[in-house]
Each structure stands twice: as C-alpha cells, then as structure tokens.
Amino acid sequence: MIFPSAADEGAIAAVRVPSFPAGNRRRRKIENYVFFSVSYRYICRHPKQNLAMALYRLESDRTQIGIDLDTKTRDNNLRHPDYARHAQIMRLVYVQSLLSGQSILQTIPSLADHFPQLDPFNPEHQACVCCIWDAAFDLHRPPHVRIGRTDCAYFFTERAACEYYRNYSGMSSAQLCEVQVLETYDCFTGDMNWLDAIDESTATARDIAAAAVRYWAGEMSADPLPEVLFQGRYRLTPVP
C-alpha cells in the first residue's frame, strides 16, 4: 500500500462517502466533455483586474450569442442538479487512488463493485467520471484562488486555442466568438497542457495532483495553451 502524504491526508479528510438516492437518475447529456477529457485553465490574479487582451470562446449554445451574459446566472456545472453527487463520487475515486496507488481507471471498477448504483459504462453515469478532473483539481486549489472551474466561463487568448476544442464532443459546430468583457468579478489563467500531458489510461491521483499544483501556480509549460477562467458580465460576438 502507498502511504498518503500530509497533502494526501488533507484531501482524504475533505471527502465523505456519498449517499445514493433511490430511483432513476436524470440523464445528463454530455456535450462539452469526452470520457476523461481534459481542458484546463489559465489566470488573472486580482478579482477586479481588467482583461485587456483579446479573448475568444467557442460557444455551442447560439442563444447565448449577442446578449449580455452574467456568470452569476448563466447555467454551469455547479448548478446542474446532479453535479454535487457526481463530484462527491469522483472525490471518493480520487482519494481511493491516492491510498491504493491504482490508476483512476483501475479504481473506478473497484468502487463500482462496492457501489452497484455507480456504473462507469452507463451513459447516464459518464458525467460522474468526467467530474474527476474538476473534483480533483478543487482539492488542490489554494485558498487565495477564489474562482473554481465549475462556476465560471472559459475563454481563450488565441483563436487557434478555440479551434483546438472542435474535436471535443458536441463542439464541432460551435460558433467562434470574440468576448467583450463588461465587468470582471474574478479571473484566473492556467495552462491546460498540464492536463493534456496526463496519460488517462494509466494516470493515478498523484499524477493529477502534480498537474494541479502546476496549474494553480500559474506555471506555463514549454508549449502552453492558456485558458481564462472568468467570472463576471460579458457579451459574445460571432467571428466570421
């Protein structure tokens, strides 16, 4: 058995065993995820800092284009009715991987043996698996970073970075938009390449933790793909 470090113990202490409500669960249509997809983010450190650089977004919901939007009211993962339960399951998976040294893919079936209600191969439950990245990263987010990955909008500093996402499920027909920032509540910029470097077929919780530490430190890789986590008011304008 791999004994946990002090940081691991802190992560373990934050996790409680989830309860599973009876009855059918609501099906979640996953349009912006791939099974074990990774997409991770970039930074502005002060909540009132202006975003002077050009920003872009690949928007799959065309009703959101051309109107004033506010992250306080716009739909996001955190407001999804199943998110809290899914994220709790994934924290449990993450901590079990820390304790056992098993990969995430090895850990999920072992948990499914103990929790029959969790079926990692059921499309209805794949959202649980997708939550692993957000759930794991939140366990390592430092206190001074107030913005999380579940209650924000995601912007890029380059058009090419938006095009990178067209290969993701549900994004092939999304509209490339320029972002007009109306008001900034908070923002953070991180390099999602730390996540892309993870081999999802063999990754353990400690591999994810190492990437998370670099991500939240704002450290850039040799070939960075910076992405902005944004909270505030903004408007999207289509780019021809």
Say what each PLM segment does.
Residues 3, 20, 33-36, 40-42:
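Aromatic (phenylalanine/tyrosine) cluster motif
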Residues 16, 25-28, 41, 45:
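Basic polycationic patches enriched in arginine
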Residues 32-33, 38-39, 50-54, 62-127, ...:
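Conserved NAD+-utilizing ADP-ribose enzyme module
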Residues 124-137:
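Active-site-proximal specificity loops/subdomain of glycosyltransferases
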